[in-house]
Amino acid sequence: MADGSCLGSGPQLGLIALLVVLLFSAVPLAQSRELRFVTLVYRHGDRSPVHGYPTDVHKESVWPQGYGQLTQVGMKQHWDLGQELRARYKGFLNESYNRHEIYVRSTDVDRTLMSAEANLAGLYPPEGPQIFNPNITWQPIPIHTIPESEDQLLKFPISPCPAYVKLQEETRQSAEYINMTTTYKAFLQMVANKTGLSDCTLESVWSVYDTLFCEKTHNFSLPTWATADVLSKLNKLKDFSFVFLFGVHERVKKARLQGGVLVDQILKNMTAAANNASNGLKLLAYSAHDSTLGALQLALDVYNGKQAPYASCHIFELYKEDSGNFTVQMYFRNESGKTPYPVSLPGCAHACPLQDFQSLLQPILAQDWEEECQTTSFIMTEETIIGLTIGAIALFIIIVVLMLLSCNEPKDDGYQHVSDEGDDHETKGLAM
């Protein structure tokens, strides 16, 4: 009886196997793309209110460290983010801390500095020789900062910038701003009356929401006027205040003076990494504020209109593709425990070629920030101040010398008496 198998005999199987091997060897296997550089921009964790309001029964003393300080909840949020980053970049970053691979910069504010510390504790728990005390699963890792008054990279809005101030004045005359002011005029007045604030505007009301939000989060009682409807309106106005800062009117012009400054630095860092000029640096982290993320995302035109939550993180990943070209992928992590969601630059795919990424962002990059900000008429450099001081001293010396010379010259009497007898008139001489 004939065998019904279609596999054939042994020699035939060997021939088929050989053909399969030859076929796959002729088609090169795709190489995996390589992650080359990562930039993180994250907001600090949960904090106490930045300000109170006059009628608030919960004064600053109820917060263990006072206003604007990171809480234990915020510390845990950033430790969690550090753990998530450790898992995400396993195989890219060294398992243990390597100072050549990572650089962290923070604004010079307690809550951002402490958030960076908590983040690094989660990212790099000490291992082996890095353990200096077996009872402490932590190691010191440097965080760099500069004074707030000098920070023109992470502290927004950047000032002084007269051109930006002018744009904000124009924004207040925009239809959207006027409409919001008209719509919420009575509401803002009610909030002012209830809080005891003398001035409550679209630009300042965010602080009222912030205080109530922090108190609610930490289980403090809220005033009876702070109903769900009131909180909802305050939340909406708070979100508008962020858009007002960097959008609403002339978004691109504002970006050139604000968020574009940070974008420009991020692009320079990625370009250096693509050109193997980053000296082994793999990850650069910026610890900052919701206003930093707002300025950044509105400059990129990817802002979702909502205030960035605590410990949220905007991620830039630079990849080297099989072709040798580089691409940039962005992600936004805005919820703990959730995978960061992809963010695409308008006009480009999610994996955006680096050259296209740079080209699309050129309109928001200032060629000469000080000139565009018109700071030359506003800020005097140290050299200018020294020059003016020397000039003033020289002028003073010249005036003193001239006065002394004038005093030493012979003087004519201002009045002369006529000695004619019988004439008692005093004749006044001319003072020449």
Curated annotation (Swiss-Prot):
Q: Which organism is it from?
A: Xenopus laevis (African clawed frog)
Q: Which residue positions does the secretion signal occupy?
A: 1-32
The GO molecular function terms of this record are: acid phosphatase activity
This protein is called Lysosomal acid phosphatase
- Say yes or no: keyword Signal present: yes
Enzyme Commission no: 3.1.3.2
Topology feature Cytoplasmic, residues: 406-432
One Pfam match, given by its short name, reads: His_Phos_2
Question: From which lineage does this chain's organism come?
Answer: Eukaryota, Metazoa, Chordata, Craniata, Vertebrata
Residues in the Lumenal compartment per record? 33-384
What's any GO biological process attached to this entry? lysosome organization
